[in-house]
Amino acid sequence: MKTKNLNGIYNVVGLNIKKYREANNISQRELSNKLSLYGIDLYHSDISRIESLQLFVRDYELKVICKILNIKLEQLYENTDKFFNF
């Protein structure tokens, strides 16, 4: 499967992942470790690339990230309209 990007961006939720991760005082390495408990193998460098919009993130990864950060999926899409030309 070829991964598409939107004007060089591979996801629109990375900035919010970073915001909520930092609000929960969780490091990228800690998030990576917590994800591995759910069977998701993302290194801390992958988390960094997701947060900088440089790595595609799968829907099931988002669900687990939300569970770890104790947020709803909708919260990851806050203020993401700026990435689209509506």
Functional labels for PLM-detected ranges:
Residues 2-8, 30, 67, 74-86:
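Short, charged recognition helix plus adjacent turn
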Residues 18, 22, 36-37, 52, ...:
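Residue-level detection of the helix-turn-helix DNA-binding "recognition helix"
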Residues 25-49:
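Short alpha-helical DNA-recognition segment
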Residues 13, 24, 40, 55-58:
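Flexible coil/turn residues that form the inter-helical turn or adjacent wing/linker of helix-turn-helix
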Residues 1-24:
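A short, Lys/Arg-rich alpha-helix, primarily the initiator
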Residues 17, 28, 44, 59-62:
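Helix-turn-helix DNA-binding elements, focusing on the entry/boundary residues of the two helices
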Residues 54, 58-75:
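DNA major-groove recognition helix of helix-turn-helix/homeodomain DNA-binding modules
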